[in-house]
Amino acid sequence: MRAISRLTGASFNTISKLMIDAGKACAAYHHENVVGVSAERIERDEIWSFTYSKQKNVKTAKAAPEGAGDTWTWTALDADSKLIVSYLVGGRDSSYANAFMEDVASRLTNRVQLTTDVHKAYLEAVEGAFGYDVDYAQLVKMYGKLSLIHI
């Protein structure tokens, strides 16, 4: 934002307010228009970031604001169209998982194949939001040295 301020000559506060207003407008547009989605495959994941400082440094940070620390952006993506069906910014616990999955389910019109990682909070959240009206899979990500199998 400082670079935008320097390039445009607009004050940093003006740029900040514009970004906040644009974000609110985009969120309202998404909430009102991304409904009744007919999708076949939904991929779910979360992205880690931090607000002000990493969680481990919040206690020693100078004047850390409320909400400082780890921040997670939950996303639900239509695997075919790449539409973000739903998103949520917050923590990574079961209360956020439940709220997020309820929102995802409310935006869909049909039974979907839903894929998540193995975060334990998903099991209860998916069942609570979709009941039995979902084909659910957890993708286990395996890291490390690859082994090639010759046939």
Locate each region found by the language model:
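Acidic/histidine-rich, metal-coordinating catalytic segments
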Residues: 111-122, 141-142
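Two-metal-ion RNase H-like nuclease active-site motif
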Residues: 37-66, 75
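Short His-Asn-centered micro-motif
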Residues: 44, 77, 87, 115-118
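Short conserved beta-strand segments at catalytic cores or DNA/RNA-binding microdomains
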Residues: 61-93, 101-102
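Inter-helix linker motif
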Residues: 135-145
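Short, well-ordered alpha-helical microsegments
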Residues: 97, 122-124
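Short, positively charged, Gly/Tyr-enriched micro-motifs
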Residues: 1-37, 47-50, 79-83, 91-95, ...
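Conserved small/polar residues in nucleotide/adenosyl-binding loops
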Residues: 149-151
